């Protein structure tokens, strides 16, 4: 087996379905040499039965679903599958990602060319096509962490002194060594990952990727950034400014300092806890206003997006729109008839929040390239999968 892909799921069955469908579109590698292990952390949305139904033995990829009876957390669930997979390479992959047809081929080529490597990451794009800064990170030393927490890194993002956390001084288009690879897409040799004993299970949700990347560096390996794009919905699916997120994230950072920078952990404990309280306070300020707005205008809690659909399955899309009471304009097209996609001159994009591409008519690489060419922050990617009758956006899913 060439490649084993591990996906940890918790109540996001449609994202997992879409992710696996994108893997199955991979070119340049034999699909019979790829296996997918989904570790379900005791989801309540019928994920296990849904995924087993979607991906039977006849599916081009071997898909195994492990059903846990409790939520083991990210690291422990990944390790659970790591000890069962058989591939030469292992890819830890978030469920809210979409690969292009070339992603696996390009990263595996890099892996074969760099036996000195620990793990590889990729260029992650947010749903508006903009670059996700988490794609490349520097080692969070006490100084780097201080710059991030105080905002110095935001003031001087492209300097090595202050902006090392996100390494924005590096060229996005170049294959380059980095310190930290995101756990959303982390590929490495199985034997090396087993030697490192996988993820540290002291972390529950955040920080595991930082810890593993650092341990690989300490062991003499090098981590790399491969400038091939994937879609990652994290900006939409993770509430970064809730108290829970802030608390768990900074606690994970403190665990990292305590483990790897023990002397610094003592004097860092106070500012880290102050940062948690400050950011938690700032995250709570908007909540009463949102509650009042949603009470006075319940529709504002889940606004109906104005969608432009590009593809050949207009009838199915109209039926889906009618079921959900949403407005979708239809442009009958494919990649051949509309080579510039939604960027074609003459298409008025102003009314639309979502540009939904039909995945049967447009390659994933085509879609991501068009959004990456002109990200605006106003319009976001939608993906319609006609065989599954599934429309996925960052904030809502329509079936």
Spans of features found by a protein language model:
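Short, well-formed alpha-helical segments that are part of the catalytic scaffolds
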Residues: 7, 12-27, 320-321, 343
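Active-site-adjacent helix/loop segment of glycosyltransferases
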Residues: 214-290
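Short, acidic, metal-binding catalytic loop of nucleotide-sugar glycosyltransferases
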Residues: 21-33, 373-374
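A short, conserved alpha-helix in the catalytic core of glycosyltransferases
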Residues: 171-174, 179-229
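Short, flexible, basic/aromatic active-site loop/helix in glycosyltransferases
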Residues: 139-178
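Conserved donor NDP-sugar-binding/catalytic core segment of glycosyltransferases
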Residues: 98-134
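Short aromatic/hydrophobic "clamp" motif used to bind/position activated sugar donors
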Residues: 90
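A conserved acidic beta->alpha catalytic loop
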Residues: 22, 40-49, 70
């Amino acid at each position: 087996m060439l490649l084993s892909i591990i996906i940890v799921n918790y109540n996001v069955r449609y994202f997992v379905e879409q992710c696996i469908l994108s893997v199955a579109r991979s070119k340049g590698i034999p699909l019979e040499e790829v296996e997918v292990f989904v570790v379900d952390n005791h989801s309540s949305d019928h994920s296990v039965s849904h995924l087993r139904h979607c991906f039977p033995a006849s599916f081009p990829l071997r898909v195994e679903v492990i059903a846990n009876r409790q939520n083991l957390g990210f690291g422990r669930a990944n390790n659970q599958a790591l000890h069962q997979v058989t591939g030469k390479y292992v890819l830890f992959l978030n469920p809210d990602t979409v690969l292009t047809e070339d992603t696996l081929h390009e990263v595996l080529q890099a892996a074969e060319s760099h036996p000195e490597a620990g793990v590889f990451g990729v260029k992650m794009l947010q749903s508006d096509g903009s670059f996700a800064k988490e794609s490349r990170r520097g080692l969070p030393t006490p100084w780097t962490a201080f710059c991030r927490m105080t905002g110095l890194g935001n003031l001087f993002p492209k300097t090595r002194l202050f902006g090392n956390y996100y390494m924005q001084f590096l060229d996005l288009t170049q294959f380059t060594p980095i310190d930290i690879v995101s756990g959303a897409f982390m590929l490495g040799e199985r034997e090396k990952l087993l030697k490192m004993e996988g993820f540290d299970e002291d972390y529950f949700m955040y920080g595991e990727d930082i810890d593993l990347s650092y341990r690989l560096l300490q062991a003499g390996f090098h981590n790399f950034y491969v400038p091939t794009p994937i879609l990652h919905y994290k900006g939409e699916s993770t509430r970064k400014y809730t108290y829970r997120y802030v608390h768990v994230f900074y606690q994970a950072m403190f665990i990292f300092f305590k483990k790897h920078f023990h002397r610094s952990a003592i004097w860092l404990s106070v500012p880290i806890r102050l940062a948690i309280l400050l950011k938690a306070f700032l995250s709570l300020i908007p909540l009463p206003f949102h509650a009042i707005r949603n009470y006075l205008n319940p529709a504002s809690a889940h606004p109906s997006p104005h969608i432009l659909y590009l593809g050949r399955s207009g009838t199915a899309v109209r039926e889906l729109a009618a079921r959900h009471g949403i407005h979708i304009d239809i442009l009958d097209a494919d990649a051949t008839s509309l080579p510039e996609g939604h960027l074609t001159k003459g298409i008025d994009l102003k009314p639309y929040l979502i540009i939904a591409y039909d995945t049967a008519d447009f390659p994933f690489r085509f879609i991501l390239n068009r959004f990456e060419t002109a990200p605006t922050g106003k319009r976001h990617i939608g993906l319609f999968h006609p065989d599954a009758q599934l429309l996925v956006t960052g904030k809502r899913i329509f079936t």
